[in-house]
Amino acid sequence: MASEGDKLMGGRFVGSTDPIMQMLSTSMSTEQRLSEVDIQASIAYAKALEKAGILTKTELEKILSGLEKISEEWSKGVFVVTQSDEDIHTANERRLKELIGDIAGKLNTGRSRNEQVVTDLKLFMKNSLSVISTHLLQLIKTLVERAAIEIDVILPGYTHLQKAQPIRWSQFLLSHAVALTRDSERLGEVKRRINVLPLGSGALAGNPLDIDREMLRSELDFASISLNSMDAISERDFVVEFLSVATLLMIHLSKMAEDLIIYSTSEFGFLTLSDAFSTGSSLMPQKKNPDSLELIRSKAGRVFGRLASILMVLKGLPSTYNKDLQEDKEAVFDVVDTLTAVLQVATGVISTLQISKENMEKALTPEMLSTDLALYLVRKGMPFRQAHTASGKAVHLAETKGITINNLTLEDLKSISPLFSSDVSQVFNFVNSVEQYTAMGGTAKSSVTTQIEHLRELMKKQKEQA
């Protein structure tokens, strides 16, 4: 139980904090991850205090020496957390006093935990988003380079989980890569909005000591300085934006995982996952389960929940700082860890899976070329709606005869439309089918190659900004 003397603001209070209240209030177990950035921010603030004449040069040197010692203790895992440490700020402040005495109390002159915590969180997120961006770009690169290698593989494309039209395997891979590039762009946008310094805002009214905030900005490598102190210490837009971007990213990863799970089933047999990303059954020896993909899919729900929870926290808050905001860090840390793990696993899955070109080609059926049959008539001058009807009649006639559409005779087809001639046989070729989609974004080889080149250039730009 914290005694009156243990309280950071003990002068105002008589008696001890209720132990249950203390347990509810403390965030120390979560905030230990902020230890290094908290010290980093304190070092910058100490230098600003010295420039403002609050600290002497000797006092600054003692404070910096103490902070460096604390940083070393955290890095070596020997920092001792006490029961009275409510959060990372009080823990570091308490330890600094133990090391250098009462001079430590000068460090927080004009500084509030309200500004400390948001500064720490922004510093942490700047670093974390750079790591996540790197992992995301590696996944995109893996998809793109695999698409380049396996560009000649053709398989069924699906809508409503029913066979629709032939596509290149590369077109499938690139569809996911393109979605992920949007996530990469959004991460960059969030990082730019995080990059605004709140330190120097005080509890809410600002800093009264003529602190040089431009110096703080430079020391902590922020791009700009917050404009309004009340907004700076309370805004968590950047948390919501990050969790929103993470939610969209997980939607895309979940979709990709679901596609690959389906394609890996024995019913499809299009691909096989590496043993490194599969598990077995505790009962059935023959099983090879796609647990890696299932976990990616399930982690999406976890991230969605974090976004929903922080939105509920923020919804009813009045202006400036409220203790409710303590919930933001757990959400951020959890999602950072989830994305970091999921992106690396997804990259591993994509880089090691083996495709079955034979099974993909076997799954191609003549009925998938019904659209091509309609387009054949369009090229002969028939309006598309009439051509669509004519092709549908051909499908029905083939079903009635118990044969595939490509086995209808020329006479059968002419009974539907006199525009059919002997060159209709060229329609029933899967390579010809995919090669007609030459418009930008299509599944023709030339178009897919253009997509690959474009994505490579885009990745270069995004890597420079990560």
UniProtKB/Swiss-Prot annotation:
CDD domains recorded: Argininosuccinate_lyase
Catalytic reaction(s) noted: 2-(N(omega)-L-arginino)succinate = fumarate + L-arginine
InterPro entries xrefs: Arg_succ_lyase_C, Argininosuccinate_lyase, Fumarase/histidase_N, Fumarate_lyase_CS, Fumarate_lyase_fam, Fumarate_lyase_N, L-Aspartase-like
Positions of 2-(N(omega)-L-arginino)succinate binding: S27, N114, T159, N289, Y321, Q326, K329
Entry-linked Pfam families: ASL_C2 (PF14698), Lyase_1 (PF00206)
Organ and tissue specificity: Eye lens.
Any one GO molecular function term: structural constituent of eye lens
Biological or metabolic pathway of the protein: Amino-acid biosynthesis; L-arginine biosynthesis; L-arginine from L-ornithine and carbamoyl phosphate: step 3/3
Key word Lipoprotein present: no
Keywords (A to Z) from UniProt: Amino-acid biosynthesis, Arginine biosynthesis, Eye lens protein, Lyase
GO cellular component: cytosol
Residues annotated as catalytic: H160 (proton acceptor), S281 (proton donor)
Enzyme Commission (EC) number: 4.3.2.1
Enzyme class name: lyase
Domain of life from the UniProt record: Eukaryota
Annotated function: Delta crystallin, the principal crystallin in embryonic lens, is found only in birds and reptiles. This protein also functions as an enzymatically active argininosuccinate lyase.
Subunit and partners: Homotetramer.
Family: Belongs to the lyase 1 family. Argininosuccinate lyase subfamily.
Name of the molecule in the record: Argininosuccinate lyase
Species assigned in the record: Anser anser anser
